[in-house]
């Protein structure tokens, strides 16, 4: 913040909720959130790098603590996929589930960075007045992830059932093959297809955005002397401990919904 005199709830929250953006073209219709893009790509590379490093150092003998943890994580995710997806899960779905979980977990975990310290670093070291560290608190990120999974479900549905079989399923389920019922079947299936990426993305976004707001409120109370620095730190630490559950749980739910949608794409009614 530029001045302590300007510090009030409105300016404090607006400052921390403003993305670093660049406009594409002459107009302002297409605006890129460069902080979201940078952090998403960076953490994607980090997640792949971590997995690659563990795999490269894996041994058949007594595993290291890191290798043992990763093996437990892979086994846990594989068991979750196995209960939902009944095809050849190792060809795509299980590796995709592992990638989604690790990536989204790292994206969510950025919420643990102290917002005021990070804001000071971004502004005074990198010259960035506005920069948001939590990509999943930006609906553009969660919708892009959900939309990618949605496209994959359509791709696999057509691949497994054929284009004709997929269209037939759209117009003939759930009420049957009577031509009089085709419009109702199609309407219900279109609504279902549209609602999947919306609910998938907004669930993750809503939880992470709310968590970020609470961290901001706690930081604002401490900065303005409402709770005091010490008591504010205690409140922040308490919420951070509880937020660990939210961060992990939301990554798990997002991954499992992706597996469920991919499983549905491989099944016939």
UniProtKB/Swiss-Prot annotation:
Q: Which CDD domains match?
A: ATP-synt_Fo_a_6
Q: What Pfam families does UniProt report for this protein, alphabetically?
A: ATP-synt_A (PF00119)
Location relative to the cell: Cell inner membrane
Q: Which GO terms describe its biological process?
A: proton motive force-driven plasma membrane ATP synthesis
A GO CC annotation given for this chain: plasma membrane
Keyword Transmembrane recorded: yes
Spans through the membrane: 35-55, 92-112, 143-163, 213-233, 240-260
Q: List the residue ranges forming a coiled coil, or say none.
A: none
Q: Which domain of life is it from?
A: Bacteria
InterPro entries recorded: ATP_syn_F0_a_bact/chloroplast, ATP_synth_F0_asu, ATP_synth_F0_asu_AS, F0_ATP_A_sf
List the keywords (alphabetical): ATP synthesis, Cell inner membrane, Cell membrane, CF(0), Hydrogen ion transport, Ion transport, Membrane, Transmembrane, Transmembrane helix, Transport
Q: Any keyword Cell wall biogenesis/degradation?
A: no
Membrane topology value: Multi-pass membrane protein
UniProt GO molecular function: proton-transporting ATP synthase activity, rotational mechanism
Q: Which PANTHER family does the entry link to?
A: ATP SYNTHASE SUBUNIT A, CHLOROPLASTIC
Q: How does it assemble?
A: F-type ATPases have 2 components, CF(1) - the catalytic core - and CF(0) - the membrane proton channel. CF(1) has five subunits: alpha(3), beta(3), gamma(1), delta(1), epsilon(1). CF(0) has three main subunits: a(1), b(2) and c(9-12). The alpha and beta chains form an alternating ring which encloses part of the gamma chain. CF(1) is attached to CF(0) by a central stalk formed by the gamma and epsilon chains, while a peripheral stalk is formed by the delta and b chains.
User: So what does this one do?
Assistant: Key component of the proton channel; it plays a direct role in the translocation of protons across the membrane.
Q: Which family does it belong to?
A: Belongs to the ATPase A chain family.
Query: What's the protein name?
Result: ATP synthase subunit a
The major lineage groups are: Bacteria, Pseudomonadati, Pseudomonadota, Betaproteobacteria, Nitrosomonadales
